[in-house]
Swiss-Prot record:
InterPro entries: ArchSynthase1/Queuine_TRR (IPR050076), TGT (IPR004803), TGT-like_sf (IPR036511), tRNA_ribo_trans-like (IPR002616). SUPFAM superfamilies: tRNA-guanine transglycosylase. The gene is tgt. Its EC number is 2.4.2.29. It catalyses: 7-aminomethyl-7-carbaguanine + guanosine(34) in tRNA = 7-aminomethyl-7-carbaguanosine(34) in tRNA + guanine. Gene3D superfamilies: Queuine tRNA-ribosyltransferase-like. This is Queuine tRNA-ribosyltransferase. GO terms for biological process: queuosine biosynthetic process; tRNA wobble guanine modification; tRNA-guanine transglycosylation. Residues 248-254, 272-276 are annotated as: RNA binding. Its cofactor is Zn(2+). Zn(2+) binds at residues 305, 307, 310, 337.
Length: 384
């Protein structure tokens, strides 16, 4: 039996408010997971992540397998002990990272052979290997090994990729069970931008049986409208008692629009990566701190923000100075701010869903940015 319990607590249109429960903690949904690729969220201590509102984080199977290797992590009893994070952890399967290697990989029925980006050594990764690695990592949510469908792709290419991922899904399920791993196992819905293929993928995954469903193969170059069509198609079809995880999508607008279409979980490197590049998220848009207009600006990043950078009184002028001097404090403060913004955005959406005011929240979200309210189709209960 899986260590995960999911409770759907409220809905407002297609937007869902729920809770993931694990022995090591609970996660309120919709939830955003900071990304700890190498076993750390860049520039942030685990205790700080808790203070920012993060309840679950993501670790990267592919990169942790290559560095430091499973033996080192096993010496610490798993990823929780290795990185000193006591809350739930989701690990991806490595499929997307292998996909990103492009010409350095060879895909077969058995799995993927690739040149390791660390030293060029030939490495093989398949469903069984991915499940064994994630067992050692001892994560709370394990993702199946899949092929990320490229974009653009013809329907034939997308179909072949989806069908391969379904065969790998069955092998992932079998290997996970054989390892007697009580972590939750999520399937991953593939099929590119073709709704009928997404439906066939979901049907196949449901026949196998999973604790939750990732929506993969997005955030790879498709348009926002193409992505939304897929989410609108899937919302009434994914079992309501299973969490839905949109993988790798992370602009604030994307989070709001995806929650409006029934998504429960997100991860993205955007808040941390953008902070390292001098871009800070706020309720009125993005502050690009390298712009000259901030050279003598004595305001915090966002007046009224409760993050350590803003509460601490660090001004835009100071942050711009640090950024121009390549001081690591700029990235650290910016990361704290951006993660606070993301976690607060999720908390505000949860509160709005509970109160039945999500669509008013959505309107005010765009109004504060000076943007037009995007259309929300009157299908599948999405529109309020």
């Amino acid at each position: 039996m899986s260590r995960l319990q999911f409770q759907l607590q409220a809905t407002d249109g297609a937007a869902r408010r729920g809770q993931l429960s694990f022995p090591c903690g609970t996660v309120q949904t919709p939830a955003f997971m900071p990304v700890g690729t190498y076993g750390a969220v860049k520039g942030v201590l685990p205790g700080q992540l808790c203070d920012l509102g993060a309840e679950i984080i993501l670790g990267n199977t592919f990169h942790l397998f290559l560095r430091p290797g499973l033996e080192v992590i096993a010496d610490h009893g798993g990823l929780h002990g290795f990185m000193r994070w006591n809350g739930p952890i989701l690990t991806d399967s490595g499929g997307f990272q292998v996909f990103s290697l492009a010409h350095r990989r060879k895909i077969s029925e058995q799995g993927v052979t690739f040149a390791a980006p660390t030293d060029g050594a030939q490495v093989f990764l398949g469903p069984e290997e991915s499940m064994k690695i994630q067992k050692v990592l001892n994560s709370d949510i394990v993702m199946i090994f899949d092929e990320c469908t490229p974009y653009p792709a013809t329907e034939d290419v997308a179909r072949d990729s989806m069908e391969l991922s379904l065969r790998w899904a069955q092998r992932s399920r079998d290997a996970h069970d054989a390892l007697d791993n009580d972590a939750a196992l999520f399937g991953i819905i593939q099929g590119g931008v073709h709704p009928d293929l997404r439906g066939r993928s979901l049907d196949g995954l449901q026949a196998i049986g999973f604790d939750g469903y990732g929506i993969g193969g997005l955030a790879v170059g498709e348009s926002e409208s193409e992505r939304n069509v897929i989410l609108e198609y899937l919302h009434p079809r994914v079992p309501a008692d299973r969490p839905r995880y949109l993988m790798g999508v992370g602009r604030p607008e994307d989070l709001v629009e995806s929650v409006a279409r029934g998504v429960d979980m997100f991860d993205c490197v955007m808040p941390t990566r953008h902070a390292r590049n001098g871009q800070y998220f706020t309720g009125f848009g993005t502050v690009k701190i390298r712009n000259a207009c901030y050279a003598r600006d004595v305001d915090p990043i966002e007046p009224g923000c409760g993050c350590p950078a803003c509460v601490g009184g660090y001004t835009r002028a100071y942050l711009r100075h640090l950024d121009r001097c390549n001081e690591m404090l700029a990235s650290m403060l910016g990361t704290l701010h951006n993660l606070w913004y993301y976690e607060t955005l999720m908390a505000n959406m949860r509160a709005a869903i509970t109160a039945g005011t999500f669509f008013a929240f959505r309107r005010s979200f765009y109004l504060a940015r000076g943007l037009d309210l995007p259309p929300l189709p009157e299908v599948a209960g999405c529109a309020g």
